[in-house]
Amino acid sequence: MLNPSRYRILAIGKTRKAWIQNGLNLYIKRLPGLTITELKDSDLKKEAQSIRSSIKTNELLIILTEEGESLTSLGFANRLKSLGSSRLLFVIGSANGLDSEIKAMANWSISLSPLTFPHEIARLLLIEQLYRAKNICEGGSYHRN
């Protein structure tokens, strides 16, 4: 079973749109223990420094990038399940992306879609997929094949 209290989302910039924040709040309630931390947006080097200082030594670094691995929802759920009790840190960069140093540090790089989304929406998509993955692993009815 997936344990959201072992997951953190680190995002550059603020969530400014109320409807996105409402969606995030809905899934945060469904995923007790999951936290989202927002870091100030800046230039890539300063953002990389903020990200590096936020990574805990026992966390696997998972970044969201255009170049990342593309998965189905079932594939994502199975991959998370295979990581077992690992602590996971999902990082969503700013509109400028992520510094190459952070990309090189990543344990796993994923892409939510070949389409480009505002970074606020990427947060909502990620948290929804985390909820969906948890539901898939628990045999719930949220995900339909």
UniProtKB/Swiss-Prot annotation:
Pfam families: SPOUT_MTase (PF02590)
GO MF terms, alphabetically ordered: rRNA (pseudouridine-N3-)-methyltransferase activity
Class in the EC hierarchy, top level: transferase
Gene Ontology CC entries for this record: cytoplasm
Record keyword Methyltransferase present: yes
InterPro entries: Alpha/beta_knot_MTases (IPR029028), RlmH-like (IPR003742), tRNA_m1G_MTases_N (IPR029026)
Catalytic reaction(s) noted: pseudouridine(1915) in 23S rRNA + S-adenosyl-L-methionine = N(3)-methylpseudouridine(1915) in 23S rRNA + S-adenosyl-L-homocysteine + H(+)
Transmembrane segment boundaries: none
EC number(s) on file: 2.1.1.177
Residues the entry annotates as binding S-adenosyl-L-methionine: 64, 93, 112-117
Subcellular location as annotated: Cytoplasm
Keyword entries, A-Z: Cytoplasm, Methyltransferase, rRNA processing, S-adenosyl-L-methionine, Transferase
Matching PANTHER family: METHYLTRANSFERASE, RIBOSOMAL RNA LARGE SUBUNIT METHYLTRANSFERASE H
Family membership: Belongs to the RNA methyltransferase RlmH family.
Subunit structure: Homodimer.
Protein's UniProt name: Ribosomal RNA large subunit methyltransferase H
Provenance organism: Prochlorococcus marinus (strain MIT 9211)
Species lineage: Bacteria, Bacillati, Cyanobacteriota, Cyanophyceae, Synechococcales
